[in-house]
């Protein structure tokens, strides 16, 4: 018999982008996946990777590869053209599989790529915890908020551009919105 607690795991936005957007850049905790309760093993920095390399192959497919504390993230094609996401710290992940695909399959070899680059931008993602083999997730790593205000700037982007300039623009926009 297993006891299980149910609580809100995330407040998520999911986008399907062109499958040609395979190059990833971000300012966040990395270079490996990082969650609110596990990010101390990562370092805040600017990282470059690929959608394929963000995938973490667990014994059973599940949500994976998220980057905690992301300030900006870019997805570009081989020519450097793409999209930039900028915001107050958010969790970010780009992958080849939908959440449903990861949830429904029991083994990685059963996974079918979606044909798009699936992007998750989460206001908050609860910690991973160790509930399957240890204590349940600590209260401080759970999403308890009921009223959420989450703004994210999406803008065309090229690798030649400075993502920090776009982040500064986004920060100015949010400061003005907070005055209203």
Question: Where on the chain are the PLM-derived regions?
Answer:
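Beta-strand/loop-rich accessory regions of lumenal/periplasmic or secreted enzymes
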Residues: 1-180
């Amino acid at each position: 018999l297993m006891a299980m607690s149910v609580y809100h795991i995330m407040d998520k936005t999911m986008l399907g982008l062109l499958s040609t957007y395979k190059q990833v850049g971000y300012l966040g905790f990395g270079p490996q996946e990082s969650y609110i309760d596990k990010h101390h093993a990562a370092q805040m920095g600017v990282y470059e990777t690929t959608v394929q390399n963000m995938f973490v192959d667990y014994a059973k497919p599940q949500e994976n590869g998220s980057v905690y504390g992301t300030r900006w993230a870019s997805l570009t094609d081989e020519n450097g053209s793409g999209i930039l996401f900028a915001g107050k710290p958010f969790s970010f992940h780009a992958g080849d599989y939908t959440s449903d695909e990861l949830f429904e399959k029991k083994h990685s070899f059963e996974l079918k790529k979606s044909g798009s680059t699936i992007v998750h931008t989460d206001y908050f993602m609860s910690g991973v915890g160790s509930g399957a083999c240890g204590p349940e997730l600590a209260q401080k790593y759970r999403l308890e908020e009921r009223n959420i205000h989450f703004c994210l700037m999406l803008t065309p982007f090229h690798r030649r551009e400075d993502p920090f300039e776009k982040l500064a623009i986004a920060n100015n926009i949010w400061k003005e919105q907070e005055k209203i």
